[in-house]
Amino acid sequence: MNESEKIDPRELSPLALAFVGDSVLELLVRQRLVEHHRLSAGKLNAETVKYVSAKAQFREEQLLEPLFTEDELAVFKRGRNASKASVAKHASPEEYRASTGFECLLGWLYLNGQLERVHQLFEVLWQQFDPDQK
């Protein structure tokens, strides 16, 4: 993407940011699983779901929220509050809204070029939830 085509995250809806953030988290989890675990594709997918489901993202957001900057917290809340009445099959409305807010934050960080911050937050959650760390 050239400079003139850059996306300004402030112009995107919270749900568009969450759409991007969902992909960011999924890619980070998949990459880490492939790097550190020799599993079949089916098992890799099952492990990925443990990190990217709405319930998992709710737990992850709860862990990371104390680390959010003021701006990050505002973006998270914007995403959480934009989440409508629809909910994931296996998540409460609270979990679904928080996971949408978390995805919104990841999308915002990614599109703002704050990849180091994305990786910093991911490392914190990975250390907490990686099954090999237990």
Regions found by a protein language model. Give the residues of each.
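Double-stranded RNA-binding/processing signature
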Residues: M1-K134
